[in-house]
Amino acid sequence: MELKATTLGKRLAQHPYDRAVILNAGIKVSGDRHEYLIPFNQLLAIHCKRGLVWGELEFVLPDEKVVRLHGTEWGETQRFYHHLDAHWRRWSGEMSEIASGVLRQQLDLIATRTGENKWLTREQTSGVQQQIRQALSALPLPVNRLEEFDNCREAWRKCQAWLKDIESARLQHNQAYTEAMLTEYADFFRQVESSPLNPAQARAVVNGEHSLLVLAGAGSGKTSVLVARAGWLLARGEASPEQILLLAFGRKAAEEMDERIRERLHTEDITARTFHALALHIIQQGSKKVPIVSKLENDTAARHELFIAEWRKQCSEKKAQAKGWRQWLTEEMQWSVPEGNFWDDEKLQRRLASRLDRWVSLMRMHGGAQAEMIASAPEEIRDLFSKRIKLMAPLLKAWKGALKAENAVDFSGLIHQAIVILEKGRFISPWKHILVDEFQDISPQRAALLAALRKQNSQTTLFAVGDDWQAIYRFSGAQMSLTTAFHENFGEGERCDLDTTYRFNSRIGEVANRFIQQNPGQLKKPLNSLTNGDKKAVTLLDESQLDALLDKLSGYAKPEERILILARYHHMRPASLEKAATRWPKLQIDFMTIHASKGQQADYVIIVGLQEGSDGFPAAARESIMEEALLPPVEDFPDAEERRLMYVALTRARHRVWALFNKENPSPFVEILKNLDVPVARKP
């Protein structure tokens, strides 16, 4: 059927289209120079209008586009419109049945996801959204018309809800799932550890996101959560023991975790590993070789001897090396270097040995060629760093030669080899769930190992437990931003905060939390105490009062109560401790550096050495170009890592903390603590 404009209407309308023809499933409008085909699957509405003389047809298309036919005789226009409209609606009714079937399939998919007694991840909801969008793009009708049809309307609205407010639907589902799990497994959460898990701990355990960061403040029971998570995966049948990988940062921590798992889960099938042990396993399985870790890794004296011998050789045999080293040590390090053959000076050798060891270690950790190291350095120090690398290159070569002679590898080499084996597909990861302790200590190299494992199976979950407030190992390569920007580095997921500490009282918590959160770069989180503490729970005291303080403690501290004396450095050990065994024989006193105290706790803590200067706390920045180029960037906030070290010291105590300061030359931290209403006592 065809509709044409009248001769006069055509002339007066001056419009590109003057005729229309109904097709099988569409309509064609045309003129002398133009033609436009409108398929029914793009047609939203047809309007028939009457002007002063002639009729007008209006075809509404997506994106607010309208095609018009003017100048037609009104009676013919009406007849054509009724015929076209009936044809279009018959076609639309047939197509709505197809659309209805597709929409019902999407509802079935949604029901499958939400009906399962499982956590709904962001990744899964994104997948459902993508599938719905793909299905809608394949519908025979424009989605704008779905509201018109009774057989499509309800299903379309449900699909729209998933497209528009998916996060709300996901949260609602997961909240219901979590409550159901906490009820169904109430006995498990009561018994899995020596004390029942609190709600925040239990919620972290059942969270099923593929990338989950559990922020565990000091004393909040992170080990309990890790053990419970492993037990939960077994209890739910979500993993077999061999599909769970539990990672710790040190051998001692791994052994303690193993013991806890045996004791609480009654299984020896889950074994905690260090990153180095994991790398060793991957290399053994992926290359059928059994690498030997160099004896030098555990022999500091032998390493120092190796590096000093090579350094002396280079300086004595090559004038350029001797000149370069003299310049480095005097200009950058500002050391006093003897005239003449300075490399033979034993005092200088002793001082330099640990530095050479550290710098070679940083180069090994980087793992790249010299050109790559130089290219990755900040531009403003790149030229100078290039000179330093050339001076260090022979020492790195000597290290590699020593490894070759021993037919061994070093720790950094282990992880690099493991990553290569994973990337080449020579080892297929059996682990569905990776649980990592002390995640704030992770380095880029270890993060790359985790990424290589997860790349093999996109469904592998990462359950990372850590505390950015206790990130104190940048000097060994740890990069705090891997925790603070967790999801940027490890993929979409969630964060859970363990909000209760079982260690210290509310006053210690208040001071420590406010102190650390003055740095806006630290993640904000709640950390509440179960016990109250008075204002004296944290006290500033002159360092001359240490003996008097220990005298007072000897009067009321119980024999089983531990007193921990902490300092920034080993050599800050108070002289008073030499007489402790006889003067305070009933006191259980331990001394350690703050770094060594990580993971420890005591009833009473005494922090010594709060002074300014070369041996001060906070420690002055003493990084060379090597550290600046090869370690993660220093944070903008002043003394950020030293502040975290102070937080660690404060939070070792259950009952009381005394911060002993130098009255003549106090640490900047003293003034900060005063501003947090920490009292200054004249005597204990």
Swiss-Prot record:
Q: What sort of enzyme, by top EC class, is this?
A: isomerase
Hydrolase listed as a keyword: yes
Q: Tell me the protein's name.
A: DNA helicase IV
- Highest taxon of source: Bacteria
Q: Where is the UvrD-like helicase ATP-binding domain?
A: 195-505
Q: Identify the gene encoding this protein.
A: helD
Any one GO MF annotation of this record? 3'-5' DNA helicase activity
Q: Which family does it belong to?
A: Belongs to the helicase family. UvrD subfamily.
Q: Name one GO biological process term.
A: recombinational repair
Q: What is the lineage of its organism?
A: Bacteria, Pseudomonadati, Pseudomonadota, Gammaproteobacteria, Enterobacterales
Q: Which InterPro entries match?
A: DExx_box_DNA_helicase_dom_sf (IPR013986), DNA_helicase_UvrD-like_C (IPR014017), DNA_helicase_UvrD/REP (IPR000212), Helicase_IV_N (IPR022161), P-loop_NTPase (IPR027417), UvrD-like_ATP-bd (IPR014016)
